């Protein structure tokens, strides 16, 4: 008898039984009905959507999620309790989109977000149990910070600064409960004053002073709860200085929905 045929004849049953055993080992529950062992989910196309290992109903170790085309969408590494995970999320290009930590499926500690175009870190935010709490930064292409906000309980609360690319402070101010509040100062690129004033819960209030590009004082105006008091000099130059203020503070919006990562 041909020994190769004999080997194949006896090995086939074991081969197929091994395949069936592997398939049987996927997506199992323990006696209490909890997920255990390797679990996979699938798209309608049949492609794997997620793959990970479970113990007494929660994920442990590495869990990977995939886009419909098979590209890795996220890699999550869980501790033995399943409560804490360290996550990397990816664009469909394969480039890193964000990385950070979850506790009980809520963002915690520092999260970094990356540009899909040049792979650079674009934003970093600090979270506490799903809410922004601490410092957040936006970055220039070169890597230096362009803006900093202080957050408390998901609201802008505290210090706020914008920077020129040479790290010189461009704007210094503050927020209370998401509203501009307190002293406001903007600087020219050489460090000289551009505008000084103050806000009262989102409204310009008190004396606002405007300076030339060389830092020389030009004139001052008074505001009460966002309303400018009559001022002849300002009446002459209202359009010019309104545009100046808008240009200076027009960049304070956050990037578009970083929470989507």
Positions of predicted regions on the chain:
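Glycine/tyrosine- and acidic-biased, solvent-exposed loop/turn segments at the edges of beta-strands
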Residues: 19-261
